[in-house]
């Protein structure tokens, strides 16, 4: 979200974010409640982070609805989760996640423009466009190795983590609110 920090479009007003894929497996930990399964705690975090990072705020209100089209597979956990977030600034986000639907996008509408990313999470890079005609292309190579190297450098050199554990805690607070 380095792009969002530098945008001339004003404040985020409306966000639409989705992360999901079709998972045909029928016996996997992601379908087991005791093991932390469910789309929200896995792919839903990507949709959630898109909204959180676009606004720079933590949500103050959550409304959610889960559904399952394959109850024979997803009888303990949700296959799909739709959730709406409200932020202190008044910005609203409509987020979706699923193990039954392929989706991978983020659109942020600002006071004076928009940003679209599709895909907004991918191992091979993220692409998008802005209302001013700017094209966004962030190629990624082996991002997990890069993050592990940066984490090790932070520990060895007493520098702040690029993605500190507190970010995960913020995500989990919202994930838990979605499930309530």
State what each model feature region is.
Residues 28-29, 127-131:
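Short, basic/glycine-rich phosphate-binding loops at helix/coil junctions
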Residues 35-42, 134-142:
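A short glycine-threonine-serine/GTX helix/turn-capping micro-motif
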Residues 42, 48-124, 145-159:
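Contiguous beta-strand/loop segments that form the cofactor/metal-binding neighborhood of enzyme cores
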């Amino acid at each position: 979200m380095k792009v969002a920090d530098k945008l001339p479009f004003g404040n985020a007003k409306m966000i639409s974010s989705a992360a999901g894929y079709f998972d045909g497996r029928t016996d996997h930990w992601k379908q087991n409640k005791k093991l932390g399964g469910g789309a929200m705690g896995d792919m839903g975090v990507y949709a959630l982070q898109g909204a959180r990072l676009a606004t720079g705020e933590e949500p103050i209100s959550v409304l959610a609805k889960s559904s399952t089209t394959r109850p024979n597979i997803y009888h303990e956990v949700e296959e799909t989760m739709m959730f709406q977030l409200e932020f202190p600034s008044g910005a609203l986000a409509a987020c979706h996640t699923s193990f039954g639907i392929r989706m991978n996008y983020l659109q942020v509408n600002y006071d004076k423009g928009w940003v679209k990313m599709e895909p907004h999470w991918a191992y091979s890079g993220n692409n998008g466009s802005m209302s001013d005609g700017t094209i966004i292309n962030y190629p990624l190579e082996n991002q997990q190795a890069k993050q592990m190297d940066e984490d090790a450098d932070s520990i060895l050199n007493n520098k702040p983590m690029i993605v500190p554990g507190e970010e995960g805690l913020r995500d989990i607070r919202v994930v838990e609110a979605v499930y309530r």
